Design a protein with these regions (language model features):
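Electropositive, gly/pro-rich neighborhoods at or near active sites that engage anionic ligands
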Residues: 1-96, 107
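Short, ordered loop/turn segments at secondary-structure junctions
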Residues: 75-77, 101-104, 181-182
């Protein structure tokens, strides 16, 4: 039990969520490293949302609201850290949610699918039963895209992105919104 008085309480709660997700098998092994990297930048920024980041959030929401087919791309980290928030946001802005994993396995996809269903969201895309297409310019498992989701989306929100896929999505004419925890990228 983490005491709420701990100066890094919120950070430790998120860290526990990541560890739990790893144990449950829907988080890639390297996901803990990615989380730690993001956490380090958070410390450097003073654990505050910067003014430019707040402005970017407003612009991102406006872009999604003006889109005809917005999709939120989720992975294991996003699911572990913010599943309820992702679902609420998707419902609020009328966006679809699609599973898209760099280290894609049927087992991970099934576990993430079940988590979204348990949390009340049954229309999850990117499942093994979905009509999957492939984005030709991407040379890894993230090339998979639901025909009615990322493949045909006009706007894609990509939380926790390193940039390679976001760049390719943008080149295909999609508006691409990333939540990159690295302020230097």
């Amino acid at each position: 039990m983490i005491p709420k008085s701990h100066p890094r309480y919120e950070s430790l709660v998120l860290r526990d969520k990541i560890v739990k997700a790893q144990k449950e098998g829907y988080l890639a092994e390297s996901a803990m490293i990615a989380h730690g990297r993001g956490e380090a930048f958070d410390y450097l920024l003073g654990e505050k949302t910067t003014f430019p980041a707040k402005r970017a959030m407003y612009a991102a929401v406006a872009t999604i609201l003006l889109s005809e087919n917005p999709v939120i791309s989720v992975n294991g980290n996003t699911t572990a850290l913010a599943i309820d928030e992702v679902i609420q946001f998707a419902k609020t802005v009328n966006a679809k949610i699609e599973i898209n994993l760099f280290y894609r396995t049927d087992e991970r996809v099934e576990k993430i699918t079940e988590l979204y269903k348990k949390h009340g969201y049954s229309q999850i895309l990117g499942t093994k039963d979905d009509d999957i297409k492939y984005l030709k310019s991407i040379k890894n498992e993230r090339a998979s895209a639901s025909k009615t989701g990322i493949y045909s989306a006009d706007t894609v929100l990509v939380p926790l992105e390193d940039g390679d896929r976001a760049e390719i999505l943008s080149k295909t004419g999609k508006k691409t919104i990333t939540i990159d925890l690295n302020p230097l990228s």
